[in-house]
Curated annotation (Swiss-Prot):
The lineage of its organism: Archaea, Methanobacteriati, Methanobacteriota, Thermococci, Thermococcales. It comes from Thermococcus kodakarensis (strain ATCC BAA-918 / JCM 12380 / KOD1) (Pyrococcus kodakaraensis (strain KOD1)). Homodimer. SMART domains: OMPdecase (SM00934). This is Orotidine 5'-phosphate decarboxylase. Substrate binds at residues 11, 33, 61-70, 113, 166-176, 189-190. The gene is pyrF.
Length: 213
């Protein structure tokens, strides 16, 4: 079985449901992304439990956006819980991002997938790409809802920095389009965990991606 490029955004509250969905879809995933809903609903220990159940990397999508000391305090506990990667905002500046990177692998938001991102984030995307190129994080977040923006970001980003793209499915993006535009990984949430058959939904997306890589 070829390595997956699919990341499950497990945006649910309930611990048992989260573990059940993670276990049944794990064969088709590269990683699982946890966000505030699951951490608030189930506690930080859910990161440890998901790793135990699936053996997959865990991305903590906290979008850290605070002063360096606060970012450092949060990241320390999240990495201790077993997270492999943390997502942080770049717009708060180099020092705040470096505080997270000192502790573990970091993914920087350079552009988001929702319509409102065009108001304040997209106008500074070039600056955020420059920051990423200088700091060399594991990866950056770019919008699968706008493949042309993924292509734009890829063309200006150092090749060793991965692109992870949310917005596939419920937000309107297509997995294969994101990959063809230059994404390394595709992040999907509701189209998998909201499906009547999450495993089958994950399998279909896994195969869609494989057709274009």
């Amino acid at each position: 079985m070829e390595e997956s490029r699919l990341i499950l955004a497990l945006d649910v509250y309930d611990r048992e449901r989260a573990l059940e969905i993670a276990e049944c879809t794990a064969d088709y995933l590269w990683a699982i992304k946890v966000n505030w809903p699951l951490i608030i609903g189930s506690g930080l220990k859910i990161i440890t439990e998901l790793k135990q159940v699936t053996g997959l990397p865990i991305i903590a999508d906290l979008k850290l956006a605070d002063i360096p000391n606060t970012n450092r305090l949060i990241a320390s506990k999240v990495f201790e819980a077993g997270a492999d990667y943390i997502i942080a905002h770049g717009f708060v500046g180099r020092d705040s991002v470096e505080a997270v990177m000192e502790l573990g692998k970091t993914i920087i938001v350079v552009e988001m997938s929702h319509p409102g991102a065009k108001e304040f984030i997209q106008p500074v995307t070039d600056k955020l790409i420059e920051l990423a190129n200088e700091l060399e994080p594991f990866g950056v977040i770019a919008p699968a809802t706008r493949p042309e923006r993924v292509s734009y970001i890829r063309s200006r980003l150092e090749r060793g920095i991965r692109i992870l793209t949310p917005g596939v499915g419920a937000q309107g993006g297509k997995a294969s389009d994101a990959i063809k535009a230059g994404a390394d990984y595709v992040i999907v949430g509701r189209s998998i965990y909201g499906s009547n058959n999450p495993r089958e939904a994950a399998r279909r997306l896994y195969e869609e991606i494989l057709e274009v890589v």
